[in-house]
């Protein structure tokens, strides 16, 4: 893989910034990029006009104890939030309206994920996974996993992937039947599926990355990380995987027979550990954020082309980076409650 980096260029241009009342932990752009939805750790929701940054509506303490997770519907004006109160709320984006409240009782709602077609919402609460229709009606729930469910993700074939200690499981999205189990002794802290859903990659508590090819169930491990690789992102083609786990962004090539037997590319500019990574929806732009608030946009090129980059910063540790659906804007959230949007 031939990717190089040059000196910073002016690729990221200032857009707008705002503050929410606590740690900005999750959210995202709505399906058409007109609004940006942000949730803070105290349980507040803020819906911003995507162009101006003006608050369309906000509401505090929607979950007692705080919000833990949020998921933006991929095709319609609704989103879901989950909290420490054991509740999932499905909201109307523009009308400040609760369309459905689901109460699972005791337990934290740590993960939410919409299927790619938006027809199903997956929820994890402790060791159990629930799947609902987009209106919030239960379709099925799983038996208990081996441990707390740490990640959720949907394949393009309407399969739900889950992680817990020692296992990745794939469920049929409609029936809840277990279709595949991929096992490895270790605590899996992060997960990403390749765009074609054949490769599943997990960051592990032991500072390694483990991945499987689902078609063969062949597994491999990539070691040498000083920290837990909690940030993972595939490019749109599934050819390149960006990983955190240190102050460097490590890029593995899945082209040909890779990454086995190949050396990764290390992108060196951050001085503190990587906290979040996000490839653009199209092309090879990669955004990275780190613990000191630095945000870098890498314009990666292959085939011996150089890559430009642009560096900026936010107030504190970067919690999330979200590309607008058209990739012409990037939103960054930080630990101090800062919300920053740049034009690309």
Q: What is the predicted function of each stretch?
A:
Residues 46-48, 88-91, 130-133, 169-172, ...:
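WD40-repeat beta-propellers
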Residues 50-52, 93-96, 133-137, 173-176, ...:
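Short loop/turn segments that connect beta-strands within beta-propeller blades
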Residues 2-22:
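A short helix->beta-strand "capping" segment at the edge of beta-propeller domains
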Residues 36, 79, 121, 160-161, ...:
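Hydrophobic beta-strand positions that form the internal "hydrophobic ladder"
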Residues 17-24, 60-67, 103-109, 143-149, ...:
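WD40/WD-repeat beta-propeller blade N-cap
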Residues 39-42, 82-85, 124-126, 163-165, ...:
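Conserved strand-to-loop turn within each blade of WD40 beta-propeller repeats
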Residues 31-32, 74-75, 116-117, 155-156, ...:
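Residue-level detector of Asp-centered blade-edge/turn motifs that repeat once per structural unit
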């Amino acid at each position: 893989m031939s990717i190089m980096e040059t000196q910073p260029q002016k690729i990221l241009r200032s857009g707008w910034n705002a503050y929410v009342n606590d740690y900005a932990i999750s959210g995202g752009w709505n399906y058409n990029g007109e609004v940006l939805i942000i949730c803070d750790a105290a349980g507040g929701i803020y819906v911003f006009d995507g162009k101006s940054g003006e608050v369309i509506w906000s509401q505090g303490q929607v979950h007692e104890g705080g919000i833990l997770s949020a998921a933006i519907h991929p095709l319609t004006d609704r989103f879901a939030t989950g909290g420490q109160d054991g509740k999932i709320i499905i909201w109307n984006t523009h009308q400040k309206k609760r369309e459905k409240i689901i109460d699972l009782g005791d337990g934290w709602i740590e993960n939410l994920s919409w299927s790619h077609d938006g027809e199903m919402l997956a929820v994890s609460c402790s060791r159990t996974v629930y799947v609902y229709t987009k209106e919030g009606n239960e379709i099925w729930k799983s038996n208990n996993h081996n441990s707390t469910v740490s990640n959720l993700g949907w394949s393009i074939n309407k399969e739900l992937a889950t992680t817990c200690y020692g296992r990745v499981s794939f469920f049929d999205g409609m029936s809840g039947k277990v279709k595949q189990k991929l096992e490895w002794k270790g605590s899996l802290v992060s997960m990403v599926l390749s765009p074609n859903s054949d490769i599943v990659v997990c960051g592990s508590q032991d500072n390694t990355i483990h991945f499987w090819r689902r078609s063969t169930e062949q597994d491999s491990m990539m070691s040498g990380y000083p920290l837990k690789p909690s940030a993972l992102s595939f490019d749109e083609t599934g050819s390149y995987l960006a990983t955190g786990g240190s102050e460097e962004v490590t890029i593995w090539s899945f082209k040909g027979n890779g990454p086995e037997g190949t050396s990764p590319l290390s992108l060196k500019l951050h001085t503190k550990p990587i906290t979040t990574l996000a490839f653009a929806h199209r092309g090879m732009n990669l955004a990275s954020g780190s613990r000191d608030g630095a945000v870098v946009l890498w314009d990666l090129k292959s085939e011996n082309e150089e890559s430009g980059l642009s560096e900026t910063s936010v107030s504190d540790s970067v919690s999330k980076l979200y590309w607008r659906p058209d990739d012409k804007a990037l939103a960054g959230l930080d630990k101090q409650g800062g919300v920053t949007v740049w034009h690309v």
